[in-house]
C-alpha cells in the first residue's frame, strides 16, 4: 500500500509486534519463566488455567532428519494434560470459537456439533450394551482330578483306593483394555469428516463408560502460535463422561498436522500393555504429517519417517496401533498424501471414506470382544 498503511485484511507492523510479544509471554508462562512484576487479572486467570490444565512445553523432533539430511534442534510442543472449560474460553485455545458479543444468558462459545455428540451417545449406548459381556466371568470346575484342591464330597472315596478326589477351577474372563484415540484436528478435517469423527469418538467414549474393565483417553492435535499443540480432552480414569457431553460440542478443527511430533510429546502418558491389560492406540486423520513453524519444516518423506519411528516406539510399549485415513472423494489411498500416510503408519494404515467412518467403531468393538 503506497500510503504506508496496511492493506485491507493485513496486519500493521505494530500489530504483528504486539502479537509476537503475546506469543512469547504465553511461552514464558508455560516454561514457568514468570518475571517478578505486577500481574494483571487477565494474566492471573491465564496462569490459573494453565495450572489447572497441567499444560507444559516438551521439546520434540530432536531426532527429525530434514529432506536434505540435516538435523534440527527440535521444537517445543504444547502439551495440555487436562482440557477444562475455562481453558477452552481462553482466546489462545486453538480448538474453540468465542462469541465476543454474547449476551449474559448466551453461551460464550460456539456450539457447532451438539447433534453429532448426541447421536454419538445414542450409538455408544447400544454398543455399550453389546460389550457388557466383557464385565462377566465364567467359572468351569473340573472334578475327579489327581491334583488340585481337595473335593470334600469325595473324601469318603479315599478309603476305596480312589485318588481322583481333587478339583481345579478355571475362570474365563476378558482382560482389561485401554484405548487412546488421537484425533487430527487440522483445518482440513472440517465439515462432514469432523462430524462423522466426532460421532464415532463420542460413541466409543460412551460405550467404554458402561464397561468396568475398559478405559479410554481422547487427545486432539493441532498447532498454535507456530508450535505443535496436543490436548488430552478426556480420560475416563479421572473424568466423568458428562465432560464429553458438555464440552466436545464446542471443539472445532484448525491448524496443521504435526503428527509424529505430537505422538512423541505424549508417549510417556500412554498406557502400555501388561499381562492383564491390552492396550490400543487409534489414530484418525485425513492426510500426511505436515507442520511448518519456527526453525522447522516438517513435511514429506522426512516427516513420514519420523512419524513411523514414533509409531514403532508406541508399538514397542506393547500397544497395538490402528491408523485410519479419512478420505473425501478421490483424495485417498492413491493420492500422494495416501502414499505418505502408508509410509507413516506401515501395516497399521487403513483407508476409509467419509461415509463409512463407523468402520472405526466396528473395528474397536471386534477387538474389545477378542480374548487372549
Name each region found by the language model.
Residues 171-284, 316, 322-332, 359, ...:
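Von Willebrand factor
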Residues 267, 287-344:
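VWA/integrin I-like adhesion module and closely mimicked acidic/polar interface patches used
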Residues 206-215, 271-277, 313-317:
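Secondary-structure transition/capping motifs at alpha-helix termini
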Residues 1-179, 192, 243:
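Negatively charged
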Residues 1-3, 8-11, 27, 190, ...:
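Extended acidic, low-complexity intrinsically disordered regions
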Residues 188-195, 248-258, 269-272, 290-305, ...:
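Short, contiguous acidic/charged loop-to-helix segments that flank catalytic cores in large enzymes
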Residues 343-372:
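C-terminal helix of von Willebrand factor
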Amino acid at each position: 500500500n503506497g500510503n504506508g498503511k496496511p492493506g485491507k485484511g493485513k496486519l500493521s507492523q505494530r500489530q504483528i509486534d504486539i502479537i509476537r510479544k503475546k506469543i512469547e509471554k504465553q511461552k514464558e508462562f508455560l516454561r514457568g519463566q514468570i518475571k517478578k512484576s505486577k500481574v494483571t487479572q487477565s494474566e492471573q486467570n491465564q496462569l490459573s488455567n494453565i495450572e489447572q490444565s497441567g499444560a507444559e512445553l516438551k521439546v520434540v523432533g530432536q531426532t527429525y532428519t530434514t529432506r536434505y539430511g540435516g538435523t534440527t534442534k527440535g521444537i517445543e510442543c504444547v502439551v495440555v494434560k487436562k482440557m477444562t472449560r475455562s481453558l477452552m474460553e481462553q482466546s489462545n485455545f486453538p480448538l474453540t470459537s468465542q462469541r465476543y458479543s454474547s449476551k449474559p444468558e448466551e453461551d460464550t462459545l460456539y456450539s457447532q456439533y451438539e447433534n453429532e455428540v448426541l447421536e454419538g451417545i445414542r450409538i455408544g449406548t447400544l454398543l455399550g450394551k453389546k460389550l457388557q459381556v466383557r464385565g462377566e466371568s465364567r467359572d468351569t470346575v473340573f472334578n475327579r482330578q489327581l491334583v488340585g484342591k481337595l473335593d470334600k464330597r469325595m473324601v469318603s472315596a479315599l478309603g476305596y483306593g480312589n485318588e481322583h478326589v481333587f478339583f481345579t477351577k478355571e475362570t474365563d474372563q476378558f482382560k482389561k483394555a485401554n484405548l487412546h484415540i488421537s484425533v487430527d484436528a487440522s483445518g482440513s478435517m472440517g465439515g462432514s469428516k469432523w462430524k462423522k469423527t466426532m460421532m464415532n469418538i463420542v460413541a466409543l467414549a460412551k460405550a467404554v463408560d458402561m464397561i468396568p474393565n475398559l478405559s479410554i483417553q481422547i487427545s486432539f492435535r493441532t498447532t498454535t502460535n507456530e508450535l505443535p499443540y496436543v490436548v488430552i480432552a478426556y480420560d475416563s480414569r479421572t473424568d466423568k463422561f458428562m465432560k464429553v457431553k458438555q464440552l466436545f460440542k464446542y471443539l472445532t478443527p484448525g491448524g496443521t498436522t504435526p503428527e509424529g511430533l505430537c505422538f512423541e510429546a505424549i508417549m510417556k502418558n500412554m498406557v502400555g500393555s501388561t499381562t492383564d491389560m491390552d492396550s490400543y492406540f487409534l489414530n484418525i486423520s485425513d492426510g500426511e504429517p505436515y507442520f511448518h513453524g519456527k526453525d522447522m519444516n516438517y513435511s514429506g518423506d522426512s516427516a513420514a519417517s519420523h512419524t513411523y519411528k514414533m509409531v514403532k516406539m508406541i508399538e514397542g510399549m506393547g500397544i497395538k496401533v490402528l491408523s485410519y485415513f479419512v478420505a473425501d472423494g478421490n483424495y485417498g489411498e492413491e493420492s500422494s498424501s495416501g502414499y505418505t500416510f502408508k509410509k507413516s503408519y506401515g501395516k497399521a494404515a487403513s483407508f476409509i471414506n467419509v461415509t463409512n467412518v463407523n468402520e472405526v467403531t466396528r473395528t474397536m468393538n471386534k477387538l474389545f470382544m477378542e480374548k487372549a
